[in-house]
Amino acid sequence: MNSTPFIAVEGPIGVGKTSLSHRLATYLQFHLLREIVEENPFLKDFYQNIDEWSFQTEMFFLCNRYKQLEDVEARFLTKQKPVVADYHVLKNIVFAKRTLHMKHYNKYERVYKVLTEDLPMPNIIVYLNASLETLLKRTDKQQLTDSSVAL
């Protein structure tokens, strides 16, 4: 296990992962690793037709997170520079299991295992939770903010 502090913050959408990660990184003077969602070119199509676009969407996220974690390991962890992330790569397999048909999931799982077998894993995982009512309010606010920014 890596002795350099590597903290991952996880939880459902809208729970405050990014906010807490940012605060922790600032307070502890750690590098902040933020999840990149907006760059996924398949996400819009995914929300319109999950069955058609789930495999491409999940593969993009997996490859993107693989590259991020590979870079973080090389640039920070191997140089004893601590990191806090607002996601854990394990979420990929959880989402894939929920969105992919079995045929695609089996392929995805094989790729996931190959890519993640030697990735750095956090030595601390913080899991946040909130009531469904709170999560719905927060995601509604995020959608309003995101749509106003897009204009």
What does each model-found stretch correspond to?
Residues 92-151:
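A glycine- and Lys/Arg-enriched "phosphate-lid" helix/loop adjacent to the NTP-binding pocket
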Residues 65-103:
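A basic- and aromatic-enriched beta-loop-alpha substructure that forms the phosphate/nucleotide-
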Residues 12:
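P-loop (Walker A) phosphate-binding loop of NTP-binding proteins
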Residues 26-64:
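Conserved substrate/cofactor phosphate-moiety recognition/catalytic segment
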Residues 20-21, 25:
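Post-Walker A alpha-helix
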Residues 9:
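Hydrophobic anchor at the beta1->P-loop junction of P-loop NTPases
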Residues 17:
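Conserved lysine of the Walker
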Residues 2-6:
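Pre-Walker A (Motif I) flank of P-loop NTPase domains
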